[in-house]
A protein has these predicted regions:
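Residue-level signal for inorganic ion chemistry
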Residues: 14, 83, 145, 192, ...
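Long, well-ordered amphipathic alpha-helical subdomains in the mid-to-C-terminal portions
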Residues: 226, 237-317
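Canonical P-loop GTPase G-domain recognition
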Residues: 188, 194-248
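Flexible active-site lid/hinge loop adjacent to a nucleotide/diphosphate
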Residues: 156, 169-197
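Alpha-helical scaffold elements adjacent to nucleotide-binding pockets in ATP/GTP-utilizing enzyme cores
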Residues: 93, 130, 155, 159, ...
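Expand to "…catalyze enediolate/carbanion chemistry for C-C bond making/breaking, isomerization
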Residues: 2-15, 51-55, 60, 214, ...
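Nucleotide-state-sensitive switch-loop elements of NTP-binding domains
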Residues: 2-49, 54-57, 62-152, 159-169, ...
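Generic beta-sheet signal
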Residues: 80, 166, 191-192, 227
């Protein structure tokens, strides 16, 4: 099947074509790039929701409830669950999230797990492209759930239109909430497992941290929504908070929303240019295994990483 054929089937919303397309952008760099070229002009309509937070915060259950709520509103939904990579298979450890199987018979919901493949920011290299596939396939909402790796989750801002930071009482989140990186990426805070002891203290801690920030007229102040994802309590309120942020971004701060899209595009462009340069360097300039040899020299403290990088860049320019 050609990229054009597959693109046509993705645009028609065929589930098998969507699955094949996401596999392509994960595993076949050239074919994946050709596919994105074919569908890119038909993207930009879906609303991307990033859900992040520490391990054990109940993010998967929360996403499952979010899907149900959006479907109740008749929105079509795509989910990308970014999982840790298995060191043995290279695949996503948790697979296609058994906790979301209640939606498996719904053709208007597409759920896919993707492996981080060692990417420290928590997002798979191909997550952005997978979101484009779901966007092109006509999904109204695309939810990206990330692995919980703390402040490295700032990367989610570059992919999502709204970032939902999920916290849970009793996991040290009173301290975590004070960390600047988490504060900077949150558009909406969720205190999940809100029926647990300490939930109200956590809400107070987050409110106290928000109070330290100065918000100008028209600025968005992240709301704090308390949920119990296992029962669905608070999930409609969370969806309303997300929709309020979307309306605010569109009406009150369109320039800021556009700037966020530009930052996202620039990040992806830099990522592709950097990867392309490195691929060219390895293919055309370096001897087989030379990059690994240089890395070994850095690890052995025989050369510093800046000098090594400068030397390789100079050779690439020659």
């Amino acid at each position: 099947m050609t990229s054009a054929d597959l693109a046509g089937r993705v645009l028609a919303g065929e589930p098998r074509a969507i699955a094949r397309a996401i596999s392509l952008v994960e595993d076949d760099e050239v074919a994946g790039a050709n596919l994105i070229r074919a569908i890119f002009s038909r993207t930009g309509r879906a609303y991307l929701i990033g859900v992040t937070g520490p391990p054990g915060a109940g993010k998967s259950t929360l996403v499952d409830r979010l899907v149900a709520e959006f479907r109740r509103q008749r929105a079509t939904v795509g989910v990308i669950a970014v999982d840790p990579t298995s060191p043995f298979t290279g695949g996503a450890v948790l697979g296609d999230r058994l906790r979301m199987q209640s939606h498996s018979g719904d053709e208007d919901v597409f759920i896919r797990s993707m492996a981080t493949r060692g990417h420290l920011g928590g997002l798979s290299r191909a997550t952005g492209d997978a979101a484009l596939v779901l966007d092109a396939a006509g999904k109204d909402v695309v939810i990206i759930e990330t692995v919980g790796v703390g402040q490295d989750e700032v990367e989610i801002v570059r992919t999502a239109d709204v970032s939902v930071v999920t916290l849970v009482p009793g996991a040290g989140d009173e301290v975590q909430a004070l960390k600047a990186g988490i504060m900077e990426i949150a558009d909406v805070f969720v205190v999940n497992k809100g029926d647990r002891e300490g939930a109200d203290r956590l809400v107070t801690a987050v409110e106290g941290t928000l109070a330290l920030h100065s918000y100008g007229t028209g600025d968005w102040r992240p709301p704090i929504v308390k949920t119990v994802a296992t029962s669905g309590s608070g999930v409609p309120e969370l969806v309303r908070a997300i929709e309020q942020f979307r309306a605010h971004a569109g009406a009150q701060a369109p320039a800021r929303a556009e700037a966020r899209r530009r930052v996202r595009a620039e990040h992806r462009l830099r990522e592709l240019v950097t990867q392309g340069f490195l691929d060219r360097l390895e293919r055309s300039v370096l001897a087989p295994g030379e990059l690994s040899d240089v890395a070994a020299r850095i690890a052995a403290r025989e050369i510093d990483p800046y000098s090594a990088a400068a030397s390789l860049i100079a050779r690439g320019r020659a």
